Amino acid sequence: ACATGAAVTITGTIGSILLFGCEPKQKENAEHSILGQTVFSPLTGELKSLKDVNDPTFSEEILGKGIAILPKEGIVYAPFDGVVSALFDTKHAIGLTDDQGMELLIHVGLETVNLGGTHFEVHISQGDLVKKGDPLITFDLQEIQKTHDVITPVLITNADDFSEIVVQKEFGPVKAGDAILTVKK
């Protein structure tokens, strides 16, 4: 009886997908739950406080609230589903906006604007829709760190639109895709 019930459930789910083109809705979207919106790490490396960034524009939260990551790999991934709202010609920074209006800036390294795009490659364009985990930018970590600090601020630039921004992971090792921030309206 259990096997038959499971088969009916599976068949019913597949049938609804095939007939109606949609999957049954979950009670809550994990990335936009009642607890807040989740930002996942765009990089693998070491999670740090913004206070550890040797640039007052970031450490004093002038551009927004968030965290910093000292990258161990040269790949920036989408930290949530959203749209590429800003892409700098110098390829060192990207702005993303999610469907709830949260605006996020990922700024690879300090003073890397001066590289003029050298050692960076973008895989998306401004206006593109991206999914969590999509590769956005690759960069030559070894070459850039020869001349620049590669610590990467990850900022909610419209932080004033939210009641709370909570760091979800202890400072230390972080993998791309780990939950790092929760942002609450």
Please report, for each region that a protein language model flagged, where it lies by residue.
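Conserved, short, structured surface segments that act as functional micro-motifs
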Residues: 134-168, 173-174, 182-184
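Zn2+-dependent peptidoglycan hydrolase active-site motif and core
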Residues: 83-113
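Short, conserved beta-turn/loop elements at beta-strand boundaries and strand-helix junctions
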Residues: 50-55, 87-92, 141
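Short, well-structured beta-strand-loop connectors
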Residues: 41, 45-47, 77-84, 124-138, ...
